[in-house]
Amino acid sequence: MNLLAIGAAIAALTGIGAGVGIGIATGKAVEAVSRQPEASGKIMQLLLLGGALAEATAIYGLLVAIMIIIFKP
């Protein structure tokens, strides 16, 4: 049972990576918009796409953690 809890915790750590990645991307997007305000529309589109992909990894990690806890392989 201990190893299952450790495995679930490691799978749930994907949320930390996603949070850091989204934070860095948002900071760079703000810098880019401050340099080129006319490109803000395109930058926001790319930021939303990148944020969605990064958040998907966190959701997959959460699902794996839940599956480890519930199904106990």
UniProtKB/Swiss-Prot annotation:
Its membrane topology is listed as: Multi-pass membrane protein
Q: Where in the cell is it found?
A: Cell membrane
Among the GO molecular function terms of this UniProt record, one is: lipid binding
Record's GO cellular component terms: plasma membrane; proton-transporting ATP synthase complex; proton-transporting two-sector ATPase complex, proton-transporting domain
InterPro entries the UniProt entry points to: ATP_synth_csu_bac/chlpt, ATP_synth_F0_csu, ATP_synth_F0_csu_DDCD_BS, ATPase_proteolipid_c-like_dom, F/V-ATP_Csub_sf
Site description Reversibly protonated during proton transport, residues in chain = E55
Regions crossing the membrane: 4-24, 51-71
Family matches, as PANTHER family:
ATP SYNTHASE LIPID-BINDING PROTEIN, MITOCHONDRIAL, ATPASE PROTEIN 9
Q: How the protein assembles, per its UniProt entry?
A: F-type ATPases have 2 components, F(1) - the catalytic core - and F(0) - the membrane proton channel. F(1) has five subunits: alpha(3), beta(3), gamma(1), delta(1), epsilon(1). F(0) has three main subunits: a(1), b(2) and c(10-14). The alpha and beta chains form an alternating ring which encloses part of the gamma chain. F(1) is attached to F(0) by a central stalk formed by the gamma and epsilon chains, while a peripheral stalk is formed by the delta and b chains.
As for what it does, the entry says: F(1)F(0) ATP synthase produces ATP from ADP in the presence of a proton or sodium gradient. F-type ATPases consist of two structural domains, F(1) containing the extramembraneous catalytic core and F(0) containing the membrane proton channel, linked together by a central stalk and a peripheral stalk. During catalysis, ATP synthesis in the catalytic domain of F(1) is coupled via a rotary mechanism of the central stalk subunits to proton translocation. Key component of the F(0) channel; it plays a direct role in translocation across the membrane. A homomeric c-ring of between 10-14 subunits forms the central stalk rotor element with the F(1) delta and epsilon subunits.
Which protein are we looking at? ATP synthase subunit c
